UniProtKB/Swiss-Prot annotation:
It comes from Mus musculus (Mouse). GO terms for biological process: adaptive immune response. This is Immunoglobulin heavy variable 1-84. Disulfide bonds join 41-115. Residues 86-117 are annotated as: Framework-3. Residues 69-85 are annotated as: Complementarity-determining-2. Residues 55-68 are annotated as: Framework-2.
Length: 117
């Protein structure tokens, strides 16, 4: 039996009208089932520690699912119960970057993932 793969596509967005505010995510990932992946979301144009970063999932043909948020100022997190044990949210304030690690990947994790302020 050949390998199967999981494709993760990453997008970012931000609320507000200030065009200088940006959230830049890492690129698409192709990973094996059972593996883990850590994706990044680098912020610029605002004070990183002052705003929550939310993570959202969208599977093909389905609606948006909120995964959780992290507050960079304190590192506090809140997760959707469905994603506890699946997603781990962290930040590196020195580089204004938020991270989401997804573990024990399955075909159900093949989706578009968004970070949003």
């Amino acid at each position: 039996m050949g390998w199967s793969w999981i494709f993760l596509f990453l997008l970012s967005g931000t609320a507000g009208v200030h065009c200088q505010i940006q959230l830049q995510q890492s690129g698409p990932e192709l990973v094996k089932p059972g593996a883990s992946v850590k994706i990044s979301c680098k912020a610029s144009g605002y004070t990183f520690t002052d705003y929550y970063i939310n993570w959202v999932k969208q599977r093909p043909g389905q609606g948006l699912e909120w995964i959780g948020w992290i507050y960079p100022g304190s590192g506090n997190t809140k997760y959707n119960e469905k994603f506890k044990g699946k997603a781990t949210l962290t930040v590196d304030t020195s580089s204004s970057t938020a991270y989401m690690q997804l573990s024990s990947l399955t075909s159900e994790d093949s989706a578009v993932y968004f970070c949003a302020r």
